[in-house]
Every structure is written in structure tokens, then in C-alpha cells.
Amino acid sequence: KGTACAISRYGSGSHLMAYVNAENEGWDLEKDLNFEVIKSLEGALEELPKGNGDYFMWEKFTTKPYVDDGPFRRVGECPTPWPCFVIAVRDKVLQEDALSINTILEIINRTTAEFKDIPSIDRMISNRYQQKLEDVQQWLSLTQWSQQQLTSTEVSRVQKKLVQLELITKEVPLARILR
């Protein structure tokens, strides 16, 4: 409370989650929330030890090696109140090349639906990202990829939360978001 949250950039997940955490903790969003832009995880590793930012909020499995071996320590978790990733396309692109967009979505959905069934995927991820095998296995057990578009209820809930946090000024009509 009242310290500087290191964020990758304004509008990023680390920035948005700082607001969610502040609200969860009952902080005054204007007085108790300050930011230091550090750009990336590498920036956090470099800048936080220098005092440029006091804490940061990043995906726990990505940062776990730096918690296990230093220089960071986990002080808590703050689950996202919305999906972590969505696919967004500009209206013009969707109008001009809907077939390609649908093909890309089919490929992504097929790949994510089958991802956990890839033989030794846990070992491949562990080796590629220098993560402990048991951490990758835990991540895989917790991670789900939706095969459906967000519902109007989900989008409305996210927008209401962003308005409440004063991160957007008003809700956008659902027809402009969901296609």
C-alpha cells in the first residue's frame, strides 16, 4: 500500500492486476497505487533490486524460478477475475479476411484442445523454459484453454469491473466486441 508497483507497461496485465489487488485489499486507488514501468520480466529482475519498484505482479509459474532461486519471493497470489488471454481482431481485418481469421481460430482451438495430449509436452516445456518438471506439470494441470468465444455475460462482467476500477470510462456495446 502506497508503494510503487513495477509494471511492464500501462494497460498490461501487470498494470490491470495491480488495480485488482488494490481493490481486493481495500486501498484507495488514487492515493495508494503508484507505478514504475520496467517493461519486462528482465526489466523487473534488473530494476527492482535497484529500488525501481517495490513489488510486481506476474504469472506465478513464469516467475517461480526467480522465487525458488532468488532474487524474488512470493508474498501472495491474486487470481485474475477474467480470462487471461483473448484473441482480438480489428473490424477491418475481420471484414476483409474473415476466412483467414476463422482458419487461424480453428488451428488455435485444435492445437490447444490437443496440447496436453502431446507426448512428453511437460518435458519439452520444462527444457525449453528451464522450469522444474513438477512446476510444468502443475501448470498443465491448472491451465485450460477455452474452445468457445466469450459469452456476453463474461464480457459484460469484465467491462463492469474495468469501469468500476476506472480503467475505462464506459462499457462498449457488446455487438462491437463479440462477432
Which residue stretches match the model-derived regions?
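Secondary-structure end/capping motifs
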Residues: 95-169
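Bilobed "Venus flytrap"/periplasmic-binding protein-like clamshell domains
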Residues: 1-65, 123, 152, 156-157
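A ubiquitous short alpha-helical element
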Residues: 6, 74-75, 144-146
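Residue-level "edge-of-site" marker
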Residues: 61, 80, 139, 175-176
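Pocket-lining segment of extracytoplasmic ligand-binding domains
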Residues: 35-36, 40-125
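A generic structural-conservation signal
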Residues: 31, 57, 76, 135, ...
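C-terminal solvent-exposed extensions
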Residues: 165-179
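Short coil/loop linkers at secondary-structure junctions
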Residues: 23, 28-30, 72, 130-132, ...
